[in-house]
Amino acid sequence: MLEYYNDADKESVYENYVKIVSKPKNINDVSITQMITEVLKQFNSKRFLYNLCCSKELTFLKNILNNEIDEDDFLDYMFEIKTLSKKFIFDQDNFCIFSEQIDNVKYAIKKFNKYGAKSDEYIYPISILRIVGFLPLEMFKSANYENTKYERKLTFEEYLSNPLLKFYTTIYEENDEKYICYANYYELIPEIEEERKNYINFKSLTSNKYLIEEMFYYGFPIYNKKVKKMYEFINQNIPYIIDYVDEARVLNDYSTVERFLKDDKARKIINEGLEYSPSCALYGLSPVDYLDLKDSE
């Protein structure tokens, strides 16, 4: 694993390192070798990998161990490969589990076969944050922790320390109030807040099962035909712009991605898909749903 990461960009390694270890060091005080050492030390806790992965990832790892899939199946497992690589579990260049993680994976699969994926229970709150961007921590606590089975078994701090939840979220403070956000959107929060000044908060966010699952796995509600067409078009033709398309969705700002598009067909497919994708700037509504609510006022 050290050889794999020694040539990697330090900032990219650090971005994932802070999501894994319980007490990360400042980027200027830690080398890549030290980061990998600390990551592996974190994985020494036997249940850590099991709690860090959702059912899709554990099923993928199980299939890898059983030699049931190989690199020819790459496009069918983009979510699993991307996330497990970021979690220091899967070597996507050689399409294999890192040797240092084999025993941890075997233990996790044994738990998965017996109990299922316990961390799947955290998919809902993670998806809501991906849809709306951020929430006051007290609101998040009220919606996901208070008066639930978690409150009877765990302190709120213990609930927040779940490895899967911690991997996808960041807690920060603004104007003496704590907030929790989808981690990848932390740098976009000032822009989200600025964009929201142009829109009404209808407080009518709906979240069906398909929306929740697909926002977690794909970042887009691909059960919608136009969104699915957009998602498949991007992955098959211009996969390198997927993060820019996601940013366009978050900010409801098509210019974020349009500058990369010279083809009218691509522009049309992507814009139509974004029209049906929930935007953080629109308080979690899609542009189409937002306009429908505005027109019905």
Regions found by a protein language model. Give the residues of each.
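Short capping segments at the starts of secondary-structure elements
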Residues: 55-59, 65-72, 128-139, 222, ...
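Accessory beta->alpha helical hairpin/"wing" motif in late/C-terminal subdomains of nucleic-acid enzymes
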Residues: 26-42, 86-116, 170-193
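N-terminal membrane-targeting/insertion segments
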Residues: 121-138, 149-155
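Basic helix-extension-helix modules of the SAP/HeH family
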Residues: 1-99
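Charge-enriched amphipathic alpha-helical scaffolds
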Residues: 76-91, 145-175, 249-290
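Long, charge-rich C-terminal accessory regions
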Residues: 154-255
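Short, amphipathic alpha-helical interaction segments positioned at domain boundaries
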Residues: 47-49, 100-131, 184-208
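DNA-recognition alpha helix
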Residues: 14-18, 139-147
